[in-house]
Amino acid sequence: MSKVFIATANAGKAHDADIFSVSACNSFTVSCSGDGYLKVWDNKLLDNENPKDKSYSHFVHKSGLHHVDVLQAIERDAFELCLVATTSFSGDLLFYRITREDETKKVIFEKLDLLDSDMKKHSFWALKWGASNDRLLSHRLVATDVKGTTYIWKFHPFADESNSLTLNWSPTLELQGTVESPMTPSQFATSVDISERGLIATGFNNGTVQISELSTLRPLYNFESQHSMINNSNSIRSVKFSPQGSLLAIAHDSNSFGCITLYETEFGERIGSLSVPTHSSQASLGEFAHSSWVMSLSFNDSGETLCSAGWDGKLRFWDVKTKERITTLNMHCDDIEIEEDILAVDEHGDSLAEPGVFDVKFLKKGWRSGMGADLNESLCCVCLDRSIRWFREAGGK
């Protein structure tokens, strides 16, 4: 299987500091940065339209932001819900509802106060929305804190309307419970994900991944650094379930290299690794996915393709079934279309010619506008040169 991805749009100097995370929904792409701002980028652009002309920013926190995720859903009575959750470097977990003005279509950020005073005392790190396709079941939010605890909430958009004919927007988060760190002393919980099969994966800085059951919050099994024993790896950078929830992809370090290991989720068995040949004197041939850390992972909508974002300035695409590399996209600062927005060196004078990739997300077919948008997969990434870039598959089916 061969795929070719082509650049469709980009924005250099998209933020005034490093862009650590990106998320997407049908309407928007959302980025967050160390400059403390959330930015919402309209997915529906006209040909040759500058993404910055349809972007909207909101200052959130002076310490900067490092994780973001967006939940978009159509609730009862066609009520449209678009919620953004983000975490700051001071440990705050913050929420915004995104709406548009009826006439101007300008984006409005409505801050939501969803945590009680005791919960606000915790220092949060990674987060993930879990959308429910069943209106009888609540959407979920999972987040980790720096002590290794995973928190799970149920999200309720409306007040109790059992005796009312109209919906009353009154968003609340109901704490379902917590999953404690499986280790003593506790380790830093670096990443988290939630699957459609009702599983939670929490990754830790010592190379351990814990799998828990969403309905009961019961820990099912740990990957006790199995990959650490094999590849001398440590910190977990990303955990990502496949769309069907049958696979879990884990990005982890091995010294200065980046590794990807696949597990099936029913029994937690390791089914293989994704790798490219390397002739480094530090490594055996064919053990690593990237020549530097793998910062992020994203499955396409079918779960057949996995994209990995590397600190080596590469996006790699993998056939999940064969575990073979399909293609590689190389980032370069000169890819940015507007010359004055090119950031070739950082504030320390170090080169950004091949900027590392902080985060990557596949976008579903039809989310972006343009030629072939309904037929082709697309994706977005954010890079160390403070750029945000969109690509789409050439061809499609």
Curated annotation (Swiss-Prot):
PROSITE patterns: WD_REPEATS_1, WD_REPEATS_2, WD_REPEATS_REGION. GO terms for biological process: defense response to virus; mRNA catabolic process; nuclear-transcribed mRNA catabolic process; nuclear-transcribed mRNA catabolic process, 3'-5' exonucleolytic nonsense-mediated decay; nuclear-transcribed mRNA catabolic process, non-stop decay; protein-containing complex assembly; protein-DNA complex assembly; reciprocal meiotic recombination. Pfam families: WD40 (PF00400). WD repeats lie at residues 21-42, 67-101, 126-157, 191-213, 238-264, 296-319, 359-392. SMART domains: WD40 (SM00320). SUPFAM superfamilies: WD40 repeat-like. It is found in: Cytoplasm; Nucleus; Chromosome. GO terms for cellular component: cytoplasm; nuclear chromosome; nucleus; Ski complex. Keywords: Antiviral defense, Chromosome, Cytoplasm, Meiosis, Nucleus, Repeat, WD repeat. Gene3D superfamilies: YVTN repeat-like/Quinoprotein amine dehydrogenase (2.130.10.10). InterPro entries: SKI8, WD40/YVTN_repeat-like_dom_sf, WD40_repeat_CS, WD40_repeat_dom_sf, WD40_rpt. Its main location: cytoplasm. Present with 1710 molecules/cell in log phase SD medium. Component of the SKI complex composed of at least SKI2, SKI3 and SKI8. The SKI complex interacts with SKI7, which makes the link between the SKI complex and the exosome in order to perform mRNA degradation. Involved in double-strand break (DSB) formation during meiotic recombination through stabilization of SPO11 association with meiotic chromosome and helping SPO11 to recruit other DSB proteins like REC102 and REC104 to meiotic chromosomes. Also a component of the SKI complex involved in 3'-mRNA degradation pathway. Represses dsRNA virus propagation by specifically blocking translation of viral mRNAs, perhaps recognizing the absence of CAP or poly(A). Essential for controlling the propagation of M double-stranded RNA (dsRNA) and thus for preventing virus-induced cytopathology. Belongs to the SKI8 family. This is Antiviral protein SKI8. The lineage of its organism: Eukaryota, Fungi, Dikarya, Ascomycota, Saccharomycotina. The gene is SKI8.
